[in-house]
Design a protein with these regions (language model features):
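Non-catalytic substrate-recognition and accessory regions of acyl/acetyltransferase enzymes
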Residues: 2-160
Length: 160
């Protein structure tokens, strides 16, 4: 019961993302990579990497592949991207990741509305819950789709 009360309290506190910094933009041909970072309430530095494919094969349009991790976690990719911060602010972290994604859309395309799909890397059951929350943070028209291989994407039905 306490966990539910803590989650409900957190939902009420998560409308504002943490302040974040765009660390780097690297463009090459039809692709780009943006790196952001921010500190959560435990002062863990979270790194957000957005790999951009301007003409995705699967969805035929700009696709963002998003990974985020605690910078103090392991160098092992599987461990790093599966690590929880245990700071009790997961929805605020997701809100900040979405703010980074919106900023990346603005930086590269003028608006998040021009992005066709967003793919989050991660195999944790939490990601489905996080994606539902992320979907609410985006403009209307974004849906959650599962494609072959188990990848879960947010897809923008407003783009052509």
């Amino acid at each position: 019961m306490i966990k539910l009360i803590e989650l409900l309290k957190e939902i009420g506190e998560t409308t504002e993302p943490y302040p974040f910094t765009l660390e780097a933009i690297k463009k090459r041909g039809d692709s780009a990579r943006l790196v952001y970072h921010f500190d959560n309430k435990n002062e863990d530095t979270i790194k957000v990497e957005i790999a951009v494919d301007m003409d995705s094969y699967y969805y035929k349009g700009p696709e963002f592949t998003v990974t985020f991790s605690d910078m103090t976690s392991s160098d092992d990719e599987d461990v790093k991207y599966g690590t929880m911060t245990n700071s009790g602010d997961s929805l605020k972290v997701i809100s900040t990741v979405i703010a980074c994604i919106k900023d990346a859309g603005k930086q590269l395309l003028g608006s998040i509305d021009k992005v066709k799909s967003i793919n989050f890397k991660g195999d944790d059951k939490r990601f489905k819950i996080y994606l539902r929350y992320a979907q609410k943070q985006l403009p209307s028209g974004w849906s959650i789709e599962t494609r072959e291989g188990g990848n879960i994407d947010l897809v923008n039905s407003n783009t052509q």
